[in-house]
């Protein structure tokens, strides 16, 4: 029997489960499969919780997000057939655009739906155990790992840590942006807020403190004009460059189409490995990427 632990069960943990179940159903894994999932929260959605504000959007177009692999990812292998995010929206009656950007609430519902789809496919040779606890300790032995929860101790052959971004321990008052409903709820118009960074998390916080506070955008002469509600705090945003992220380009890919790399690909890496005994990231790899 193969015993596997998955610690944290958002989208990354769900992807691990999909791969394990696919390989078992495709007989790549021959042993009986026993999977232990450690997560006290809703399973599958992770940071895309259906309980958050519907104002918060996903940063990827609908047709390019899926939990289910296909022949472009796993050639000559068995794979579980399932919908991508765009196909899921259509099946639920939404008038979705394959290149549209939708809320994390909807993505969370898709992820939780995908988890249930995978569960229904599990045979008698696949056992999935849900441990509604935080994993507090992982001890590596010679041939196995011991995962200790608050009240549970499990021995597994392999352990996957898919906990997402963890918080650092700081000696000064700096707060995490998430969950946004908690981090922004007690902020008033009299407050001054500092936001370190100009990425996606900054956009989330600014959205909650502006349009989430009753402000709204109005289109006039092909320009978006923001109309404040008067409830917004003073917002100071800073980063190393003090420049916002570049906007996403309009996608030109079809659904499930893969970009074909020209410079940084497996053929180039094989040539470099023949030429150099050990690759230097800065000298051989980084120039191919940038």
Predicted regions and their residues:
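Extreme N-terminal starter segment of soluble prokaryotic enzymes
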Residues: 1-4
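Short, charged/polar micro-motifs that form catalytic or ligand-binding hotspots
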Residues: 6-7, 97-105, 149, 189, ...
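Rossmann-like dinucleotide-binding core of oxidoreductases
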Residues: 11, 16-45, 160-290
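Glycine-rich active-site loop/strand segments that organize a redox cofactor
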Residues: 38-113, 240-288
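Helical element adjacent to the flavin cofactor pocket in flavoenzyme catalytic cores
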Residues: 108-130
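A conserved short coil-to-beta-strand element within the FAD-binding core of flavoproteins
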Residues: 131-144
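Core beta-strand elements of the Rossmann-like FAD/NAD(P) dinucleotide-binding domain
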Residues: 149-158
């Amino acid at each position: 029997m193969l015993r596997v632990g998955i610690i944290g069960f958002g989208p990354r943990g769900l992807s691990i489960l999909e791969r394990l179940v696919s390989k078992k159903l495709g007989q790549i894994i021959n042993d009986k499969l026993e999977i232990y999932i450690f997560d006290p929260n809703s399973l599958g959605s992770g940071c895309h919780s259906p309980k958050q504000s519907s104002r918060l959007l996903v940063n990827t177009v609908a047709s390019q997000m899926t939990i289910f692999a296909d022949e472009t990812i796993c050639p000559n292998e068995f794979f579980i057939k399932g919908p991508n995010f765009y196909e899921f929206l259509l099946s639920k009656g939404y008038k979705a655009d394959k290149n549209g950007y939708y809320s994390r609430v909807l993505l969370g519902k898709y992820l939780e739906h995908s988890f249930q789809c995978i569960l229904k496919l599990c045979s008698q040779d696949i056992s999935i155990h849900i441990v509604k606890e935080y994993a507090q300790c992982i001890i590596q032995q010679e041939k196995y790992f011991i995962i200790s929860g608050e009240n549970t101790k499990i021995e597994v052959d392999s352990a996957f840590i898919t906990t997402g971004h963890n918080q650092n321990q700081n000696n000064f008052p700096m707060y995490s942006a998430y969950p946004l409903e908690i981090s922004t709820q007690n902020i008033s118009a009299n407050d001054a807020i500092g936001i370190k960074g100009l990425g996606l998390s900054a956009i989330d916080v600014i959205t909650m403190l502006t349009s989430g506070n009753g402000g709204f955008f109005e289109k006039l002469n092909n320009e978006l004009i923001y109309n404040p509600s008067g409830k917004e705090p003073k917002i100071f945003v800073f980063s190393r460059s003090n420049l916002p992220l570049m906007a996403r380009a309009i996608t030109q890919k079809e659904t499930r189409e893969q970009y074909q790399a020209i410079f940084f690909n497996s053929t180039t890496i094989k040539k470099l490995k023949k030429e150099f005994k050990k690759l230097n990231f800065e000298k051989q790899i980084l120039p191919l990427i940038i």
